[in-house]
Amino acid sequence: IRESGTSRGSFYHYFEGKDALLSSLSYLFDRKYEELSPTLSPEEDRFQQLMYLNRELFAMIENSISPDLLARLYSSQLVTRGEKHLLDHNRTYYKLLRRIAAEGQARGELRRDVTVSELVRVYALCERALIYDWCLSGGGYSLPQYSQTLLPMFLGSFRGGQRSS
């Protein structure tokens, strides 16, 4: 409250508590995905679309969200008894990932022997793991750069037989 420069009354008018403020970060991420979605080329390989979305979101995170604040979000999601916003499959994030995964399977760019739900679950798990490590490291390295190295290695086995650059 002190860092935001607002009164306690104003803060609690907009947020029920600190957890509500922290969970609003997931909505910030969704707004970024809504901004990026129209920029996806229909011709681009869906695996590459996922890498693009990751790079852009992680660049936004690195440039505008402190590792400490992000760590608090993750911490609150671990202990909350209520809604876990990061896992809400009705979020824009999950809807967009499901669409891309389904299109990738239909185009032969992503494996068809793995369900769309499993592809999305593993992708989201990898992103959370990278963010968690970045927070543990106090933001000591470039999140988007490191992710662009590791994410293709983590997810490469999900690529289909058709490869395009």
Question: What does each model-found stretch correspond to?
Answer:
Residues 1-20, 24:
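Helix-turn-helix
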Residues 52, 56-59, 94-95, 99-107, ...:
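C-terminal peripheral helix-coil segments that are non-catalytic and often amphipathic
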Residues 25, 29, 33, 37, ...:
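Hydrophobic recognition helices of helix-based DNA-binding modules
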Residues 24, 28, 38-65, 116-123, ...:
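Hydrophobic alpha-helical connector segments
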Residues 40, 68-77, 130, 134-138:
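Secondary-structure edge/capping motif, primarily at the C-terminal ends of alpha-helices
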Residues 48, 85-90, 106-122, 141-145, ...:
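All-alpha amphipathic helical-bundle segments outside canonical DNA-binding/catalytic cores
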Residues 22, 26, 30, 83-94, ...:
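Amphipathic, non-transmembrane alpha-helical scaffold segments
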Residues 58-98, 109, 118:
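Short secondary-structure transition hinges
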